[in-house]
């Protein structure tokens, strides 16, 4: 019983040994390229992308028309408290 298991393991090991060295060299270069592009994307996001962000996000949203002028309307906090009145009692 154990001899047949050893023969099967030997046959699997012989298949692994028959892979050419260029296969492993190709895997190495694929891994290097993946790491290169990962660090390149990280550099672009962290360093180059920050340049295009405006300093004042509220003003940028006002310029786009998404947000009304934040300085023109006073912020009312009482409306937020009214929502939770039923839960607090």
UniProtKB/Swiss-Prot annotation:
One Pfam family it belongs to: Dexa_ind
Family listed: Belongs to the DEXI family.
Name used for this protein in its record: Dexamethasone-induced protein homolog
